[in-house]
Amino acid sequence: MDIVSLAWAALMIVFTFSLSLVVWGRSGL
């Protein structure tokens, strides 16, 4: 795995985590 695909994977993980955190926060749990 090269550095570009590794950076894309990390970016997708952070984006998915932040998005789910916003949805989870808005649901009031």
UniProtKB/Swiss-Prot annotation:
Keywords, in A-Z order: Electron transport, Membrane, Photosynthesis, Plastid, Transmembrane, Transmembrane helix, Transport
One of the protein's GO biological processes: cytochrome complex assembly
Transmembrane feature ranges: 3-23
Assembly description: The 4 large subunits of the cytochrome b6-f complex are cytochrome b6, subunit IV (17 kDa polypeptide, PetD), cytochrome f and the Rieske protein, while the 4 small subunits are PetG, PetL, PetM and PetN. The complex functions as a dimer.
Organism this protein belongs to: Cuscuta exaltata
An MF annotation (GO) of this entry: electron transporter, transferring electrons within cytochrome b6/f complex of photosystem II activity
Cellular localization per UniProt: Plastid membrane
Name this protein carries in UniProt: Cytochrome b6-f complex subunit 8
Topology versus the membrane: Single-pass membrane protein
InterPro entries listed in its UniProt record: Cytochr_b6-f_cplx_su8_sf, Cytochrome_b6-f_cplx_su8
Family: Belongs to the PetN family.
Recorded name of the encoding gene: petN
